[in-house]
From Swiss-Prot:
NADP(+) binds at Y24, G25, S26, Q27, R47, S51, G132. This is Ketol-acid reductoisomerase (NADP(+)). It catalyses: (2R)-2,3-dihydroxy-3-methylbutanoate + NADP(+) = (2S)-2-acetolactate + NADPH + H(+); (2R,3R)-2,3-dihydroxy-3-methylpentanoate + NADP(+) = (S)-2-ethyl-2-hydroxy-3-oxobutanoate + NADPH + H(+). Involved in the biosynthesis of branched-chain amino acids (BCAA). Catalyzes an alkyl-migration followed by a ketol-acid reduction of (S)-2-acetolactate (S2AL) to yield (R)-2,3-dihydroxy-isovalerate. In the isomerase reaction, S2AL is rearranged via a Mg-dependent methyl migration to produce 3-hydroxy-3-methyl-2-ketobutyrate (HMKB). In the reductase reaction, this 2-ketoacid undergoes a metal-dependent reduction by NADPH to yield (R)-2,3-dihydroxy-isovalerate.
Length: 328
């Protein structure tokens, strides 16, 4: 797999176009500010509200989504996945200029045919592999965020446009990898659900609950199962698992080898395959889309339960007393 850098693309391609950023959440703000700082003309498409005010505070003059799209060569859709198809149908599709392209930072709505691409409309994806605030922070720092890019239909014009956009958004410094809408979507969802969010959060809570229910102090359980997680991940992020094992004690490393597979064993791997199958068959997407159409009852209930878990109160209390938790 080839990794592209700034020298492998032409940032002037996107600089010659007007980009409408539709949405001004975490990703929308990062894209808009990075593109502007890279010399791209950016217009913001928003409804009145807090995001509208935030964009104005950042020096933009937001317009309605329809107006922003109608004057743009590229419409980058950065609204939440669950409402993007509705925004596209009502405020984007019929307002695109001839020859304009639709862009995405995640392939969900294209992969699952919520936004059909065709009838002369080209689409590309420039997906930074980090939350929005980190996309902005790494751009400012000069090392950027890795990007995945794709085009539909697959043609050199859209490919070059996607790479150019990724460079302007900071990807040229960190690396740009070509993929497809389907592969980006399926791997992204699996990583979030099985490892980065779903798997990791459940692992932390299970460890915390095991220690507390066995009679250990909640504060000790928090330190061992949550606080130290970042320290471990930072080492792995810099040098991989081998670097981690070089930095820990022989006792910790031996425990990794003999107990890790007991926790993450055959049953977990089988569950991961079932999660991936739900993603690949579209079952998860169908459930998520219906969740959004039903006013998100599962999300609401689960968010409430997360806030009520004992680890949250313990963590908040300890973090308020630790200068290291505040970056000082």
């Amino acid at each position: 797999m080839r990794v592209l850098y700034e020298r492998d693309g032409d940032v002037s391609i996107i600089r010659e176009r007007v980009v409408a950023v539709v949405g001004y959440g975490s990703q929308g703000r990062a894209h808009a500010m990075n593109l502007r700082d890279s010399g791209v003309e950016v217009v913001i498409g928003l409804r009145p509200g807090p995001s509208f005010d935030a964009a104005m505070s950042d020096g933009f003059m937001p317009r309605s989504v329809q107006e922003a799209v109608s004057i743009a060569d590229v419409a980058m859709l950065l609204t939440p996945d669950e409402c993007m198809a509705d925004v596209y149908a009502k405020a984007v599709r019929d307002y695109l200029r001839p020859g304009a392209s639709v862009a995405f930072a995640h392939g969900f709505n294209v992969c699952y045919n919520q936004i059909p691409i065709g009838n002369g409309v080209g689409a590309f994806m420039a997906a930074p592999k980090a939350p929005g605030h980190m996309v902005r922070e790494t751009y400012i720092a000069g090392w950027g965020t890795p990007h995945l890019v794709a085009a539909k239909p697959q043609c050199e014009h859209l490919r070059a446009l996607a790479v150019s956009y990724a460079i302007a958004n900071g990807g040229g410094a960190a690396g740009i990898i070509e993929t497809t809408f389907v592969d980006e979507t399926e791997t992204d969802l699996f990583g979030e659900q099985a490892v980065l969010c779903g798997g990791l959060v459940e692992l932390i809570r299970a460890g915390f609950d095991t220690l507390v229910s066995s009679g250990y102090e909640p504060e000790l359980a928090y330190f061992e199962c949550m606080h130290e997680m970042k320290l471990i991940v930072d080492v792995m992020n810099r040098g991989g698992v081998a670097a981690l094992n070089e930095s820990i004690s022989n006792n910790a490393e031996y425990g990794e080898y003999v107990s890790g597979p007991r926790v993450i064993g055959a049953a977990v791997r089988s569950a991961m395959r079932r999660v991936l199958n739900d993603i690949r068959t579209g079952r998860y997407a169908k459930d998520f889309i219906m969740e959004g159409r039903s006013n998100s009852p599962t999300l609401t209930a689960c968010r409430r339960a997360v806030g009520e878990h004992p680890i949250e109160a313990v963590g908040a209390r300890l973090r308020s007393r630790m200068t290291c938790a505040h970056g000082t």
